[in-house]
Swiss-Prot record:
GO terms for biological process: carbohydrate metabolic process; glycerol-3-phosphate biosynthetic process; glycerol-3-phosphate catabolic process; glycerophospholipid metabolic process; phospholipid biosynthetic process. PANTHER family: GLYCEROL-3-PHOSPHATE DEHYDROGENASE, GLYCEROL-3-PHOSPHATE DEHYDROGENASE [NAD(+)] 2, CHLOROPLASTIC. Sn-glycerol 3-phosphate binds at residues 106, 133, 135, 188, 241, 251-253. This is Glycerol-3-phosphate dehydrogenase [NAD(P)+]. It is found in: Cytoplasm. It comes from Clostridium botulinum (strain Alaska E43 / Type E3). InterPro entries: 6-PGluconate_DH-like_C_sf, 6PGD_dom2, G3P_DH_NAD-dep, G3P_DH_NAD-dep_C, G3P_DH_NAD-dep_N, NAD(P)-bd_dom_sf. Keywords: Cytoplasm, Lipid biosynthesis, Lipid metabolism, NAD, NADP, Nucleotide-binding, Oxidoreductase, Phospholipid biosynthesis, Phospholipid metabolism. Its EC number is 1.1.1.94. Belongs to the NAD-dependent glycerol-3-phosphate dehydrogenase family. Pfam families: NAD_Gly3P_dh_C (PF07479), NAD_Gly3P_dh_N (PF01210).
């Protein structure tokens, strides 16, 4: 059995920590919030992020990063995309070189437009694995069948991570296309936010089906331009993740969009969700990136205007519908 440290004690990080603890691993969780740490250690709960959950006794929480990661064989980065670099800087020279870093964050770094595995690589000289795919913490803790993907430049490390997480209800595939896996997981949050806005505006299944299908095209278009393989975008980390995030009541991106579509101010909607809405950051980052490299992403264009230029969401949908006529396949 292994020693695994989770950085971040949010809902999905906690769900995965419980999965690994129940497999017999020694698991630690780092969280800056002393109340979360005490809730885990004393009450064996984490009510701030996921209620009615029993945390196993072989999980220990810390508010000290160095103690939480001491002698860890695996470190799971279960934190928002914008905090990845700062955490990795803190880990530098404090962890073993053979420790495998597993990122479950989805997004790209603002201002640099770098995929998160590249951000980690710039700060740490460790094997890096990305775990991604269609999954919500609420279903993982109920042991409902879930299937994800691990990817890495080091496929031996990916295979280790696959073995670490694999259970009878949690199936993990490997995929060598790291670019495709990361881009699919990041861009689908943009489309999910837009899907929520459609729901908030009262549009129907026809409209959402069109949005998701054309959203898949945007994922494929930007992903291919960045070096990803098209078949990856139609797999678990692209289409699979898009479906679950656009349709599930567990999806915080969809829920934020629902509030915005219902008339709530963007910042108030994010505040009401109470957790990071990665689609907002991803929309800004990918809007800037596609402008630089010349990739067409009309849904991202409209969502950017809604989020950052106060465009009326309904007029944004009309603008999409009135775009120049063209063939579906291009």
């Amino acid at each position: 059995m292994s020693k695994v440290s989770f950085i971040g004690g949010g809902s999905f990080g906690t769900a995965l920590a419980i999965l690994l603890a129940e497999k017999g691993n020694t698991v630690s969780i780092y969280n800056r919030d002393k109340k979360v740490v005490d809730d885990i250690n004393i009450n064996r709960r984490n009510d701030k992020y996921i209620k009615n959950l029993q945390v196993p006794s072989n999980i220990k929480a810390f508010d000290n990063l160095e103690k939480a990661t001491e002698d860890a064989e695996y470190i799971v980065l279960a934190i928002p995309s914008h905090t990845i670099r700062s955490i990795c800087k803190q880990l530098k020279n404090k962890i073993k070189q053979e420790t495998i870093i597993i990122s479950i964050a989805k997004g790209i770094e603002e201002h640099t437009d770098k995929r998160l595995s590249l951000v980690i690589k710039e700060e740490l000289n460790n094997p890096i694995v990305v775990l991604s795919g269609p999954s919500h913490a609420e279903e993982v803790v109920l042991k409902l069948p879930t299937t994800l993907v691990v990817s890495s430049e080091n496929m031996n490390a990916a295979s280790e991570a696959q073995n670490l997480f694999m259970t009878s209800f949690f199936r993990v595939y490997t995929n060598e296309d790291l670019v495709g896996v990361e881009v699919g997981g990041a861009v689908k949050n943009i489309i999910a936010l837009a899907a929520g806005i459609l729901d908030g505006l009262g549009y129907g299944d026809n409209t959402k089906a069109a949005l998701m299908t054309r959203g898949m095209k945007e994922i494929s278009r930007i992903g291919s331009a960045l070096g990803g393989k098209e078949e990856t975008f139609y797999g678990l980390t692209g289409m699979g993740d898009l479906i679950v995030t656009c349709t599930s009541n567990h999806s915080r991106n969809r829920k934020a969009g629902l509030l915005i579509g219902s008339g709530m101010d963007v910042n108030k909607a994010i505040e009401k969700i109470g957790m990071v809405v990665e689609g907002v950051k991803a929309c800004k980052a990918f809007y800037e990136l596609k402008e630089k490299i010349g990739v067409s992403m009309p849904i991202t264009d409209i969502l950017y205007k809604v989020l950052f230029e106060k465009k009326d969401p309904k007029s944004g949908i009309e603008e999409l519908m009135l775009r120049e006529k063209k063939s579906e396949i291009f």
